[in-house]
């Protein structure tokens, strides 16, 4: 705060109007500087909350907009995760779609858009290759992203802080910028917006979040239905 006051001194005032304008500018910029300085601390809180949650269950709604093809889509279902390395998106709308990781293998079975096949690949742990929207952005983010404060906001009725994460090495990941909404009460991330390199925007809202609750092992298991062709995409 002292630095902000020093930077706003008027060495050679040009009349009362100039002084008033300068004071107003300083008053407006000081909170913004403070908020931006707090962004790493807010992110640290989100990381700590993420690691405290050994399991998590939530309802999710995904909004996808792709300007390249002029399309938009809304889908929903249940998101489950268990540390380390297990997660599942199980869609209710469209029913039957699933993306899950069992700790070693990532499965994508999307009969609504790719009927008759399931894609499997080996989990690599490399940035940009995880479909886990929490682990991808909360696993050691300070080393991979530049973080800044966007604005105070809310998710539903819950006050939250919106942060922007920009990859330190642009062009190495499939996204250009990520926005996360961190709950002020429990530091859980309740909304994620991914701005992909293609121009598509994917927003995922997490609701009814429950942490450290029992999750059956079957939630992270996938067996291809009879007659479904398995495509191995490991590399």
Where are each of the predicted segments found?
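N-terminal leader/targeting segments and the immediate start of mature chains
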Residues: 2, 30-72, 82, 224-235
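Bacterial N-terminal signal peptides
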Residues: 17-28
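Gly/Pro-enriched, hydrophobic low-complexity segments
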Residues: 36, 123, 143-235
